[in-house]
């Protein structure tokens, strides 16, 4: 089975032989791909069913909450931290990003871009929160509590003195222009590092 587009990019970008913590690792799909290339991947996942599935796949995963349990990891415990499609579900995204870069010098952060043109059009035209391929549930059922945009995330990391090493913008599974990312990218993947 093919990896989700953001996970495929992250899997390709993580160097072999590194230590990785996948925060919000889901069923361990990315960890399996990383393990196949010689990465020592560990996972933190809030959903018990996903933890069980990941462990059944042979992955090292603990049940925990990114909002509270990242503090239990020592400084520089990993080479990379990964937070894929999870930032928008955290209580304090700013604190979670700080914790990622405390436990690893670099982090991959991917998220749906709530400023994508379809989202903007749905709000303008219908006056309602949209339901899209990347945001597939109604506003009252969504786990998303912080609707982040590419520009918002750039502002956050700039304010915290965090370096951007690389950015990928995707519309569907295809790259989109960085110049038009604010409104054309359905989701973004940032590789960030301590300042």
Question: What is the predicted function of each stretch?
Answer:
Residues 1-17:
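Conserved alpha-helix/loop element of class I SAM-dependent methyltransferases that forms part
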Residues 16, 76-77, 103:
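Alpha-helix C-terminal capping/helix-to-coil transition sites in glycosyltransferase folds
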Residues 24-26:
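Class I SAM-dependent methyltransferase "Motif I" SAM/SAH-binding loop
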Residues 29-69:
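Class I SAM-dependent methyltransferase SAM/SAH-binding core
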Residues 69-75:
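Short conserved loop adjoining the S-adenosyl-L-methionine
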Residues 80-92:
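A short SAM/SAH-binding and catalytic strip from SAM-dependent methyltransferases
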Residues 95-99, 106-195:
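S-adenosyl-L-methionine-dependent methyltransferase catalytic module, highlighting the catalytic core
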């Amino acid at each position: 089975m093919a990896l989700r587009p953001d996970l495929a990019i992250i899997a390709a970008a993580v160097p072999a032989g590194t230590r990785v913590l996948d925060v919000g690792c889901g069923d361990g799909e990315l960890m399996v791909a990383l393990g196949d290339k010689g990465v020592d991947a560990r996972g933190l996942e809030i959903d018990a069913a996903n933890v069980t599935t990941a462990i059944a796949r042979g992955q090292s995963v603990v049940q925990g909450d990114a909002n509270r349990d990242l503090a239990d990891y020592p400084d520089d415990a990993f080479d990379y931290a990964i937070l894929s499609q999870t930032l928008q579900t955290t209580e304090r995204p700013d604190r979670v990003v700080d914790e990622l870069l405390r436990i690893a010098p670099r982090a991959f952060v991917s998220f749906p871009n709530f400023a994508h043109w379809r989202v903007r059009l749905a709000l303008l035209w219908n006056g309602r929160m949209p339901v899209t391929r990347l945001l597939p549930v109604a506003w009252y059922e969504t786990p998303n509590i912080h609707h982040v945009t590419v520009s918002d995330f750039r502002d956050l990391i700039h304010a915290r003195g965090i370096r951007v090493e690389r950015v990928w913008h995707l519309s569907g599974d295809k790259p989109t222009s960085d110049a038009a990312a604010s409104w054309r990218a359905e989701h973004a993947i940032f590789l960030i590092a301590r300042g």
